Amino acid sequence: GVLFQNSKSTIDPKKYTEKIFNEFLKIKGKFKKEKIYNIINDKNKLKLLTKDNYIKDFDKVIICAGAQSGFLSKLFGDFFDIVSERGYHLMYQNYGNIIKRPIGIGKQGFYYTPMDDGLRAAGTVEIGSNNKQINHSRIKWMEKRVKETFDVKDLPNKVWLGFRPTLPDSLPVIGESKINSNVIYNFGHQHLGLTLASYSAEIVKKIIYSEKLDKEIDLINPRRFDS
């Protein structure tokens, strides 16, 4: 086995992101949850069309919607071969102290992580769509592996399915749309969304304010897939 020392982790990603979100609100950021049906490219403004045909004008739009980003980019006229890596996690509420650090077992294809609310067994990959239907045979297989690894007699108290947005080269898309430079893409981070979040935000900030970018940005430029 291999032990990675001095690494960083979080025992509750949801609480971590909620704290960041609350800081955003404290500096007078605004949040509104609405479904967008179209993005209209105007000369001076970007117009977002909502369910009630209400049009909102913006100077810049950042498309950062995970596995749904491909749908939004198509509305604007940019097409990316983005798919979902469907991944599962099982939470065992009474077993959070059974290990002290994340443990990955290669032949199983998932990690065990001690969390605030229990032991999480998470991972595996199903390449497909954003279909929310759970593959119960996959759940049963994971439950069996957990029992083989630990002295766990209970069934998981929570089962969750998530969608990892993935592109053909396994790298994210971060950069300006080729159709309108005021549309900025930031998606496709697959398994590394939380890990790369702050670095990706720094890149987006530099793009917005026309600051100098590192040469490595070419590796994640949206235009790299142009034929």
Where are each of the predicted segments found?
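Active-site catalytic microenvironments for nucleophilic, acid-base chemistry
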Residues: 23, 27, 71, 75, ...
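C-terminal catalytic lobe of FAD-dependent flavoproteins
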Residues: 7, 13, 148-227
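Active-site substrate-recognition segment that forms the wall
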Residues: 56-181
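Mid-domain beta-loop-alpha active-site segment that forms a flexible
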Residues: 3-22, 67-68, 138-145, 193, ...
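Hydrophobic/aromatic beta-strand patches that form the interior of the parallel beta-sheet core
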Residues: 32, 62, 184-186
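Helical element adjacent to the flavin cofactor pocket in flavoenzyme catalytic cores
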Residues: 2-56, 60
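General beta-strand recognition
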Residues: 47-49, 120, 184-185
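Short, conserved active-site loop motifs that form the nucleotide-linked donor/cofactor pocket
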Residues: 28-30, 119, 183
